[in-house]
Amino acid sequence: MNPNQKIITIGSISLGLVVFNVLLHVVSIIVTVLILGKGENNGICNGTVVREYNETVRIERVTQWHNTNVVEYVPYWNGGTYMNNTEAICDVKGFAPFSNDNGIRIGSRGHVFVIREPFVSCSPIECRAFFLTQGSLLNDKHSNGTVKDRSPFRTLMSVEVGQSPNVYQARFEAVAWSATACHDGKKWMTVGVTGPDSKAVAVIHYGGVPTDVVNSWVGDILRTQESSCTCIQGDCYWVMTDGPANRQAQYRIYKANQGRIIGQTDVSFNGGHIEECSCYPNDGKVECVCRDNWTGTNRPVLVISPDLSYRVGYLCAGIPSDTPRGEDAQFTGSCTSPIGNQGYGVKGFGFRQGTDVWMGRTISRTSRSGFEILRIKNGWTQTSKEQVKRQVVVDNLNWSGYSGSFTLPVELSGKDCLVPCFWVEMIRGKPEEKTIWTSSSSIVMCGVDYEVADWSWHDGAILPFDIDKM
């Protein structure tokens, strides 16, 4: 064969292979259309898988078209039943890590919100981390000046517990610079406070829809808990403050059903100061450990009954748990009166364990750094100084901040008692560090039947960020 004949032969074979390949594709398409055309779905094959998760049914509808699969998630809530939440708090020996969001570390290169006041609350099927955003992202120019507490850009949003407060997984809850949220077993209720200092309004959402409002009645920065509210047998309770932060203010307990207020009562507490209460259900009542921003370095205690009757006083323990505070040895404790003259304060929490109390506090007496939780024998009912357990969560070389309480409902934990849990905010940036922003991450701990070793689950972000160097 001469060279020209070889070229012609190779070309003919190649052309034949191409034609054969095209014919195979045509036949494949014809056969596919004929087979799918015999079905009742006009070429679309649908399959439905239903999985039940407690009170929720999640439907996955799978649609196949040739080589493409589309999975469409169709959420469906069957209404569920109200959580009971009348059980007692479980007696625990220590607290184990539940989650750590690492929000600021991730935010150095990820789309993470600038936040403060994070907290956790649980439904029968999940726990969610709530937080107040500043309407801006970390490492962005809009993060400048976010040390400010109240602005029209602040919103309450949430993610599944353990996730960073990122743009892609966060769910909008309310416009708010102060907030609380809780689940009654059927739907989430949120309370978001927003507006001007003199005429702030709290908007109540139930199932994502605005259902009621509370207007400022004093005209001096209406505010609420910055942690989980409490639902018992379908009714949800929370505490609000209106008035000065450094002298006598006014305090109210609210009760709602399906997002609509069905009761309220004023708390008479002359000489005492209540704000930013950390509340939880226990033995059919709501127990709250709050912040005295006026004088006391001991914490106010508010116990609420379903009929809105209440008992108010101070955490009896002879060891102070607010910051700033004096030396433990010089503190006497009181069940009825504020002790100390430090003023200011920080949001904190405590859990009653019979007559004992678990109480969290910063390790530093003067600044928001370090965090520990102490068990004081008979500290709920007496001015006891007997510390029977201590666990370090954040060492004193690292920043902490607010802390608060929540519980795991029996529907979620499978126990016959309510598991006590708490979160610790770890504030970074202004005013302590050289940045243009203020934000925080958080560690979450839950009670267990075993002692847990001391460690420091601190924030660990390396500052300043790029935006701070511009």
Swiss-Prot record:
The keyword Transmembrane helix applies. Ca(2+) binds at D292, G296, D322. Residues 1-14 are intravirion. The chain crosses the membrane at residues 15-35. Inhibited by the neuraminidase inhibitors zanamivir (Relenza) and oseltamivir (Tamiflu). These drugs interfere with the release of progeny virus from infected cells and are effective against all influenza strains. Resistance to neuraminidase inhibitors is quite rare. One of its GO terms (cellular component) is virion membrane. Disulfide bonds join C90-C417, C122-C127, C182-C229, C231-C236, C277-C290, C279-C288, C316-C335, C421-C446. Homotetramer. This is Neuraminidase. It comes from Influenza A virus (strain A/Turkey/Ireland/1378/1983 H5N8).
